[in-house]
Amino acid sequence: MLRHSPQFSVYRIALTLFFMMLSLLYLFPIFCLLLGSLKPSSELLRVGLNLDIDPKVMSFDNYTFLFNGGSIYFKWFFNSLVLGLFTTVLTLFFSSMIGYGLAVYDFKGRNIIFVLVLIIMMVPLEVMMLPLFKLTVGLHLIDSYTGVILPFIVSPVAVFFFRQYALGLPRDLLDSARMDGCTEFGIFFRIMAPLMKPAFGAMIILQSLNSWNNFLWPLIVLRSKEMFTLPIGLSSLLSPYGNNYDMLISGSVFAILPVIIIFLFFQKYFISGLTVGGVKG
């Protein structure tokens, strides 16, 4: 058989080596980040790529300063965690119900709403920044976390994804639950939502990543330094009056940890959710 042929074995080995090299290429910036976080600013500002591993200049002083009780870093870190948690939960809650409704219920204007969702998906966020800002000012939500969260409690991408996934749910369960006297909300939360775990797992990863990395909108809305999120706080370390590259790099190391932890928890749902949800129609 082909799988036992020498040509196939060589192909598998070559393909494995290729992906190993590609993985190392992707991991190289992470290695540089970890290495740079252990060096002082004087070493980081050297000309050229500095990959020297010198125990004499490398230390954990950057992390010691970062963990100092007087450091505002953990305030930024906590702000990002809270905003990311609330934004992700609200986005999944509303987007899943909207997507489920568009897939299951037959009502007038359903297709028009779905087309509008597709159109909004194609509009860059930057195009909507000015009207969103004017609306936020009118609601007196500037320099508040509500102003940061409110525009993102419904995601057109998540609505589309949940709708596509819900199209594959068995309708017999709906009829059986209705015959047993279950309410529509009860059907969704008790029966259909558990069946949509892969979709929720995939969206938790994507929405958490979007919320954690959200930079432009919080930068526009937030004014107080104590309310900054982590991306804004780290960017504030770079200024015309001085650049704290050592703090920036060590802070960036911890900034990637929550995303890695979330992916490790929900990775088993990620591929299956994207695969199934992306092909239903």
UniProtKB/Swiss-Prot annotation:
It is a multi-pass membrane protein. InterPro entries: MetI-like, MetI-like_sf. PROSITE patterns: ABC_TM1 (PS50928). One of its GO terms (cellular component) is plasma membrane. It comes from the Bacteria. The keyword Phosphoprotein does not apply. It is found in: Cell membrane. CDD domains: TM_PBP2 (cd06261). The complex is composed of two ATP-binding proteins (MsmX), two transmembrane proteins (AraP and AraQ) and a solute-binding protein (AraN). Part of the ABC transporter complex AraNPQ involved in the uptake of arabinooligosaccharides. Transports alpha-1,5-arabinooligosaccharides, at least up to four L-arabinosyl units. Responsible for the translocation of the substrate across the membrane. This is Arabinooligosaccharides transport system permease protein AraQ. The gene is araQ.
